[in-house]
C-alpha cells in the first residue's frame, strides 16, 4: 500500500514501491525509484534518481541519477528554527524558508544511514 496526499506528478516509468508515503508537493521523474518505507515531502526527484529503502527526503531536490543509500535522510529543519541560508558558489543566499532539506546534483551518491543537514 502506498500513501499519497497532496498534489504530485509521477512520471511514466517511475517505480513507487510498497509502503511509500508521499505528501506535499512531490514530482517524481521518469525511471526514478522510491522504495519501500520511504517518505517524500515537498520533493523534486529528477529522472532515474534512486531513493530505494527507508529514506526520508523532505523539502529537497535530487538530481538526475542521484542515489540515497539505505536509511539516508535529509534533515529539513534547523535545530534553532531560524531561516535557512544556502551557500552558493561564493555567497550566501537567504531562502526565506524555515524548512529546506538538501540539493543533490546529478549522479550524487549518498552512503547508507547518512544524515544530510
Stretches found by the model and what they are:
Residues 1-117:
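Structural signal for interior beta-strand "rungs" in well-ordered beta-sheet cores
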Amino acid at each position: 500500500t502506498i500513501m499519497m496526499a497532496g498534489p504530485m506528478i509521477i512520471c511514466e516509468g517511475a517505480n513507487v514501491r510498497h509502503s511509500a508515503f508521499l505528501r506535499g508537493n512531490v514530482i517524481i521523474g521518469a525511471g526514478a525509484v522510491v522504495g519501500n518505507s520511504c517518505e517524500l515531502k515537498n520533493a523534486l526527484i529528477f529522472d532515474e534518481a534512486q531513493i530505494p529503502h527507508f529514506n526520508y527526503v523532505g523539502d529537497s531536490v535530487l538530481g538526475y541519477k542521484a542515489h540515497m543509500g539505505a536509511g539516508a535522510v535529509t534533515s529539513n529543519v534547523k535545530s534553532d528554527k531560524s531561516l535557512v541560508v544556502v551557500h552558493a558558489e561564493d555567497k550566501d543566499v537567504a531562502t526565506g524558508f524555515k524548512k529546506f532539506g538538501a540539493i543533490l546534483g546529478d549522479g550524487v551518491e549518498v552512503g547508507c544511514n547518512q544524515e544530510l543537514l
